[in-house]
Amino acid sequence: MKKLEALLENSFNIRFDDKRLLETAFTHTSYANEHRLLNISHNERLEFLGDAVLQLIISEYLFAKYPKQTEGDMSKLRSTIVREESLAGFSRYCSFDAYIKLGKGEEKSGGRHRDTILGDLFEAFLGALLLDKGIEEVRRFLNQVMIPQVEQGTFEKVKDYKTCLQELLQAKGDVVIDYQVISETGPAHAKQFEVAVLVDEDRLSKGTGRSKKLAEQDAAKNALAQLSEV
């Protein structure tokens, strides 16, 4: 963890008082499960906390930055900023991917490069930083790492297929859109999900992905392509 501590201090001017929090943030469940006798904590609880503080800080930023935008527009932009792929990208930008502790099976299957794991890692780090330093330090870190990309308009170019599908269908009248998991295959470290998108309980299309969120986006993308051919 010494190299990680040096990275945080040199790149972001962050120094943890409670080193155990930092280590927990970078410990995946697969590693903790393989070392049960050591009673090692993993990062899922910190991820929960980090997700909450990230949503709050980004919401506050968008509210202040875009006084004329509607609630719907701000929600759409926020969802692209905090989506799995975006957070995984920030983990890579910060070089966090080099320091996460993974189980042997997860490591062999490419877990170090998986968006789901890296996105969760970024949130877990925020949770640990919140507990160790407080919300203003989390805000400072996000202002350094995330906000510059927001201000460059990076996320306004990202397609949220679920939102696009919802807007298209609801423009034609009130409809109920639902996403249902059809199948879940593969070992825990390499899951593959198949999801169907239903409109008023009728199946419109299907999609696949390494997580439920990615499979839902793929299903919505396929539905939009299908509707464009009608």
Curated annotation (Swiss-Prot):
Q: Give the residues the record marks as binding Mg(2+).
A: 47, 120, 123
Catalytic activity reported: Endonucleolytic cleavage to 5'-phosphomonoester
Q: Where is the RNase III domain?
A: 5-134
Does this UniProt record's set of keywords contain rRNA-binding?
yes
UniProt keyword terms in alphabetical order: Cytoplasm, Endonuclease, Hydrolase, Magnesium, Metal-binding, mRNA processing, Nuclease, RNA-binding, rRNA processing, rRNA-binding, tRNA processing
* Matching CDD domains: DSRM_RNAse_III_family, RIBOc
Q: Which residues cross the membrane?
A: none
Q: Which GO terms describe its biological process?
A: mRNA processing; regulation of gene expression; rRNA processing; tRNA processing
Q: Where in the cell is it found?
A: Cytoplasm
**What cellular component GO annotations does this protein have?**
cytoplasm
Task: Provide the E.C. number(s) assigned to this enzyme.
Answer: 3.1.26.3
Physiological role? Digests double-stranded RNA. Involved in the processing of primary rRNA transcript to yield the immediate precursors to the large and small rRNAs (23S and 16S). Processes some mRNAs, and tRNAs when they are encoded in the rRNA operon. Processes pre-crRNA and tracrRNA of type II CRISPR loci if present in the organism.
The record's annotation in PANTHER family points to: RIBONUCLEASE 3, RIBONUCLEASE III
Query: Quaternary structure per UniProt?
Result: Homodimer.
Q: This protein is called what?
A: Ribonuclease 3
Organismal lineage = Bacteria, Bacillati, Bacillota, Bacilli, Lactobacillales
Gene giving rise to this polypeptide:
rnc
